[in-house]
Amino acid sequence: MDRSAEFRKWKAQCLSKADLSRKGSVDEDVVELVQFLNMRDQFFTTSSCAGRILLLDRGINGFEVQKQNCCWLLVTHKLCVKDDVIVALKKANGDATLKFEPFVLHVQCRQLQDAQILHSMAIDSGFRNSGITVGKRGKTMLAVRSTHGLEVPLSHKGKLMVTEEYIDFLLNVANQKMEENKKRIERFYNCLQHALERETMTNLHPKIKEKNNSSYIHKKKRNPEKTRAQCITKESDEELENDDDDDLGINVTIFPEDY
């Protein structure tokens, strides 16, 4: 079986499976992005999370949903309010931790070149911890990730260790991260649409590719500092650089793993 046929087989099998996530469906903020990728011949998504704020209890088992020895006392993909956290904390028997987990997306790609397009758009959109994995069987996976998470302990052995004022402060930080996370998702989706439209036009009209390459070389000589994608504004760049300084300069990384 050739690679293209094998990829189509993998895609059909993956998209026909039931959603086994806790929620059981794709998060609202990434539905359009996921559908857009799955409609393309060269991609399909294997998992996603739009980002969430959650309160975990790592301690005595309670009646909440269990996962990896933790109780999920609260989880939301929207902005969170203090009253909900205070009520949820009353159920904690062990060590309760407030977390914000940013957007994550895993996409299997038909070829490495396809993954590189997504990777470039992810990096330019602020997801600077993104990477590509190539398996021994030829499976090429892209993980879209960032590092602007949050994890703060609130209680120990069921005893609250912080004030309500501090919880309110933490939620303001978490909510700001959630709002920035949503902006990055929208930026990634918009950049991806433009990039794939350009790729389609280039494939349909090979002469455009030659012309664009010549124009790019000419512009690069005139303005060597202008290297970022057109869809990212200067203001957005500064905002992202301030938030993810540790991730600047990440390039495509390929890890040989077996699937």
Curated annotation (Swiss-Prot):
EC top class, as a word: transferase
Keyword presence, S-adenosyl-L-methionine: yes
GO cellular component, one term: cytoplasm
Single annotated GO MF: tRNA methyltransferase activity
Xref: SUPFAM superfamilies: SSo0622-like
InterPro entries membership: tRNA_yW-synthesising, tRNA_yW-synthesising-like_sf
Reactions performed catalytically: 4-demethyl-7-[(3S)-3-amino-3-carboxypropyl]wyosine(37) in tRNA(Phe) + S-adenosyl-L-methionine = 7-[(3S)-3-amino-3-carboxypropyl]wyosine(37) in tRNA(Phe) + S-adenosyl-L-homocysteine + H(+)
Keywords: Methyltransferase, Phosphoprotein, S-adenosyl-L-methionine, Transferase, tRNA processing
EC number: 2.1.1.282
Positions bearing Phosphoserine: S25
Pathway listed: tRNA modification; wybutosine-tRNA(Phe) biosynthesis
GO biological process, one term: tRNA methylation
Similarity remark: Belongs to the TYW3 family.
UniProt cross-references to PANTHER family, sorted A to Z: TRNA WYBUTOSINE-SYNTHESIZING PROTEIN 3
Function: Probable S-adenosyl-L-methionine-dependent methyltransferase that acts as a component of the wybutosine biosynthesis pathway. Wybutosine is a hyper modified guanosine with a tricyclic base found at the 3'-position adjacent to the anticodon of eukaryotic phenylalanine tRNA.
Protein name: tRNA wybutosine-synthesizing protein 3 homolog
Organism annotation: Homo sapiens (Human)
Lineage of source species: Eukaryota, Metazoa, Chordata, Craniata, Vertebrata
